[in-house]
Amino acid sequence: MSSYPRNYPFYNWVPKWLGILILVLMFIPILTVGGVYSVNSTEMMSGLGIISEHVTFTNFATSIGMAAFCPFLYRLVVIRREKMMCLAGFSMMYGLSYICAETDSIFLLALCSVLMGFLRMVLMMVNLFTLILYAGRIEAYLKIKPGLEPVDGEGWDKLDIERSIAQPGIYLFFMILGQLGTSLTAWLAYEYEWQYVYYYMMGMLLVCILVIFVTMPYHRFQNKRFPINFRQFGNATLFCIPLVCFTYVMVYGKVLDWWDDPTIRMAAITAVLTGALFFYMESTHRSPYYQVGVLKLRTIRMGVLFYFLLMFLNSSAMFVNVFAGIGMKLDNWQNASLGNWTMLGYFIGGMITIFLSMKKV
């Protein structure tokens, strides 16, 4: 970090409080912009004359794109070029948002959703690690750098305590901002037309690009070799294809009468073949895309299970929204307003978890 300006990633004239505020506010478009918005799904379906399965499918496509990012985490955060990555990411999300606002093709909408899910995770992690460095002067990526693991039990215990304190705070931060973004898009869809959600988010992206241009200087890449190559994006594509095909079968199966529809049969065959090819490549390559072997660890399996339950029980999840809309006859704006109360629960639960972690419970 010695070669970087004192106020990295900003110019020296930017006050620290303003830099922290900019990095925090940039999370709102990062967490909110997507291929489709579930809070304006009713208006979108009536405006385009589409069925709810289309919105569900594209929502899952966004999640698949986010999952495809995971192996790129360390390679991207060590690049340490906030301005370049944010400008590229926000610009691509702007173009994809415009396509989603104008297109009536479900295939194109799903493709854009996968790409936007991947870009969302890229921008989220890059901005998070930069915020931690700028606000706390902590190089968070060193905590996940291979070769820097603790060498004794005391070191592992200290690392576990640090993670158990930091992770609830990070989850609390993201979930509150995510709920605020959901409320914002629900209000826009309620007050205006559903297309205005896309246009408003595109405006937010342009504001972010302008702020980055004004407040952040250009930094050269420090290493001679770029840590990412195109072959890894091929692996990510092969990871996404079977999941998207499987999602297509599960979402559209009932509507299209399952195996009587040729697209369902084709999607199922494609999912099986590409899934088998993916696992074959993962088992034979010296540096696999996903370290499937980590699932042998009990702590990893328990973590995946608890995170799944967390997302399943989250009040902003799709299942709860559907229940509130059909069972309680609430519109999307009322549903989002009701969901705002979950932020209080997020805060209470996060504070309790952090307190217990500090007490080494």
Where are these regions (language model features)?
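12-transmembrane solute porter fold
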Residues: 17-30, 38-39, 71, 289-361
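Extracellular/periplasmic helix-loop-helix junction of adjacent transmembrane segments
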Residues: 38-69
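Helix-loop-helix hairpins in multi-pass membrane proteins, especially solute transporters
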Residues: 78-231
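Hydrophobic transmembrane-helix bundles of small-molecule transporters
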Residues: 190-305
